[in-house]
Amino acid sequence: IAYMWNNTLQPSSNPENPDLLSIYIPEWPERIMIAYPETGLTLILGSDYFGEAKKSFLRMAMYKVKEEGGLGFHAGSKLLRVYDKNHELKDVGFIMFGLSGTGKTTLTIHDHGLTGEEKSIVRQDDVIFMDENGYCVGTETGFFIKTEGLNPEQQGVLYKAATTDRAILENVKVYDDGKVDFDDVSLTSNGRGIILRSEVPNTDDTIDLEKANKIIFITRRNDIVPPVVKLNPDQALEAFMLGESIETSAGDPTKAGQSKRCVGTNPFIMGPEIEEGLRLKEILQNNPDMECYILNTGSVGAKGDFKGEKLSIKVSTTIMKEIARDTINWVEDEEWGYEVPVQVNGIDIEKYNPRNYYTEEEYKVLASRLKAERKAWLAKYELAQSTRS
């Protein structure tokens, strides 16, 4: 476990005197994690899962960053260098929030089909620290990826990195001859791998992001949430506090498909969660050049035996590319208050309009249910809905 964690870190300037310490006792009869933020100590009892080591250190680091006036986010980061609608070459920084299984790593590492002077540059996959100006400090030189179903056709970059001699695999089927089978989930569906950032194309020597120009809240819903919506700061606060998606096999396989909410899509938060949401809203209000979006990587229109029109990786990566280029035409959705796209280059966006798949009454029932769920969740934080969402 220590070897795995070391493969995600930059060299330490003072390895003999660590700021944070985590102790595993896997033989403990109960599974309990105890964190002491004042001293930086975490006890991991009854588990030998590497993810608990990663979570223990990043949880503590986020807490200390918050104490110093910043924010720690469970988010990936990248830079898209694109020609905008005025044909000017610009660097656009993205950070992407997302629970396990929503596609955060896939979207972080994807090249978006950019060529020539246009390119995608990967910064971080999992945790960043943001200051009041939107500058994001990176934390790791390795990526902790979900391996279930990994294949060279759809996720070539990740597959190649995960099958090198330097990759470290956990809960993955490996045969005697060394062949790796990412489709075999007989051990568990939560297969994982640590890949080195240097093994991933489109990386450079920098893990920091100069500015988070675009903030993406990734969700995975299957009915009435559009492929992408654009948010104002109040709506962004709500999206952050909702941390909305559905459960996947990477989380709790017994609840896969059920609604799930986690503030900031971040299981690392210590202290009052509302403080983090309000601080993010303040940063957005003070930096009007930072824009927020919800990106749905699930499907739209699910009903009965129809699982919905799938929002493919190509759809999501194209949307992000056109957000960076500032070429999307937006209109306000009168029912929800946020903005929705009416034209996206490279996509027949009307094909993914949720309203096309339901009768007016069916849509009304689903919308009322979702609004009620959101209202009940936000009420826990004494946060009244400030929008129609």
Question: Residue locations for each model-derived region?
Answer:
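Post-Walker A helix-loop "phosphate-sensing" segment adjacent to the P-loop in P-loop NTPases
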Residues: 112-127, 134-135
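Short conserved micro-motifs on helix faces and helix-strand junctions that flank
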Residues: 98-100, 123, 293
